[in-house]
């Protein structure tokens, strides 16, 4: 109610004026210029931090001049923007506000963003967004609405927008559907954070590939403690790249996340022990790091890298000459922390030429940080040396940090040695750090390398053992 005791400077608005879609107009009409502070941002959707307030049950009012980072309603409303997934059995799931029907089982074959309705849309929708420095207007045709089941209908946003190669400096992109403006990030699953998100969801092969493609641009936008949280299993071989991928073609090569010393990986990736399957891992042509991650200076937790029904390889592309390179399945080099991670089924291949140094390991190429509870099964580590220095180990090519409670199963082979120096070991090709409570079962083959069952007698080892002379690998599921 209202009356003589209203606070000075306030104007009464009844329920109808503040509910549903009318609230965007009401905020402009009744608040007028109440928010005039310049904060360097664009138009915004305000974020209601007060529990129990009426506005929390509806879309947030649109305010101008305030930087905005979170766009999702507190309560789901039909006829709004949602994140959606398509599964191998033909079913759909979506996430919007407090409504979620996405699954943690089965295989995701496609994902994206779109408008969801509880009945068939009555008319076509006009969509406006910026792309390539120009304003684009497109139409979502009601005749193309997809029956998602459960009484919901989906009109997907244009693929050119969902798979844009542009990275917004505000992290979120703006899209206007009819008279409503939304902010979202098409490269990942939706975030509910009011500011630059402290946690970003990774759910599909497209999203993990986007992290590889655009990490260099996203890295300076995110706080150092930002967590990239994997929320379900990811399978590259089962994803429908033709209909949902960036280029419409199957991903045959993925570069490391944090692919150089200029832009290393500095954040937190938590795999949640969900498998990541069938990723074709290659360095950039002439790059110094190869693996799922390149140079890790952040934290990798609970990452399980597998190959599915066939073996895949980690490859160093280009000619390695007069420089140092690092190759491993999980990471090329670790200067940060790795905890409770596993890799299985990835062969590692590289060749070293004049004046170069190559560190190769089944798990990481080189460790200068801390690794605890790491495991790897490598069908083959294969390399050659031509007047170069080559250091190979079933677990890591070199270690100057700490490795504990870890093990490796591998088949390590040097094809050719011409000059230079080659060290071949079951666990670590070089060790000037510390290795604790770890073991390996490794077959070593070399025409003339310095060969060690576990690691060279340098550095420190404690409670470690090795088994050599056979061929070993995991079979079946990987359990952490």
Identify the residue ranges that each predicted region occupies.
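Short, surface-exposed linear motifs at loops/turns and structural transition points
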Residues: 74-189, 212
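Predominantly extracellular beta-rich ligand-binding scaffolds that present long acidic/polar faces
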Residues: 1-79, 177-180, 184-480
């Amino acid at each position: 109610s209202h009356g003589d005791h209203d606070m000075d400077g306030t104007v009464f608005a009844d329920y109808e004026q503040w509910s549903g879609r009318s609230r965007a107009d009401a905020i402009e009409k009744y608040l007028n210029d109440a928010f005039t502070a310049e904060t360097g941002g664009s138009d915004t959707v305000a974020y209601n931090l007060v529990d129990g307030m009426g506005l929390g049950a509806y879309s947030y009012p649109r305010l101008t001049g305030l930087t905005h980072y979170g766009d999702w309603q507190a309560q789901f409303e039909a006829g709004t923007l949602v994140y959606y997934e398509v599964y191998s059995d033909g079913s759909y799931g979506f996430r919007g506000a407090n409504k979620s029907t996405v699954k943690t089982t089965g295989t995701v074959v496609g994902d994206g963003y779109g408008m969801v309705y509880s009945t068939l849309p009555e008319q076509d929708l006009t969509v406006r967004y910026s792309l390539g420095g120009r304003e684009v207007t497109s139409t979502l045709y009601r005749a193309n609405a997809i029956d998602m089941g459960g009484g919901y209908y989906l009109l997907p946003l244009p693929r050119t927008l969902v798979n844009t190669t542009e990275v917004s400096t505000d992290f979120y992109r703006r899209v206007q559907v009819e008279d409503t403006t939304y902010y979202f990030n098409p490269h990942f699953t939706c975030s509910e954070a009011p500011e630059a998100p402290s946690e970003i969801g990774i759910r599909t092969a497209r999203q993990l590939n986007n992290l590889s493609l655009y990490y260099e641009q996203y890295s300076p936008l995110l706080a150092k403690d930002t967590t990239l949280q994997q929320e379900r299993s990811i399978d590259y071989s089962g994803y429908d790249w033709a209909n949902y991928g960036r280029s419409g073609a199957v991903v045959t090569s993925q570069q490391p996340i944090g692919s150089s010393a200029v832009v290393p990986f500095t954040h937190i990736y938590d795999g949640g022990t969900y498998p990541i399957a069938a990723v074709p891992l290659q360095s950039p042509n002439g790059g110094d790091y190869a693996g799922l991650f390149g140079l890790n200076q952040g934290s990798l937790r609970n990452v399980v890298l597998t190959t599915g029904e066939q073996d895949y390889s980690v490859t160093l592309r280009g000619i390695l000459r007069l420089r140092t390179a690092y190759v491993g399945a999980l990471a090329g080099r670790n200067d940060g922390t790795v905890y409770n991670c596993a890799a299985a089924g990835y062969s590692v291949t590289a060749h070293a030429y004049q004046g170069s140094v190559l560190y190769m390991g089944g798990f990481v190429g080189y460790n200068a940080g801390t690794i605890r509870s790491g495991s790897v099964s490598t069908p083959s580590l294969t390399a050659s040396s031509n007047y170069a220095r080559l250091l190979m180990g079933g677990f890591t090519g070199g270690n100057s940090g700490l490795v504990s409670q870890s093990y490796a199963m591998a088949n390590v082979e040097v094809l050719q040695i011409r000059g230079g120096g080659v060290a071949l070991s079951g666990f670590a090709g070089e060790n000037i750090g510390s290795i604790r409570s770890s073991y390996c079962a490794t077959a070593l083959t070399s025409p003339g390398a310095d060969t060690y069952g576990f690691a060279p007698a340098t550095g420190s080892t404690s409670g470690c053992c090795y088994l050599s002379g056979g061929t070993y690998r995991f079979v079946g599921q990987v359990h952490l």
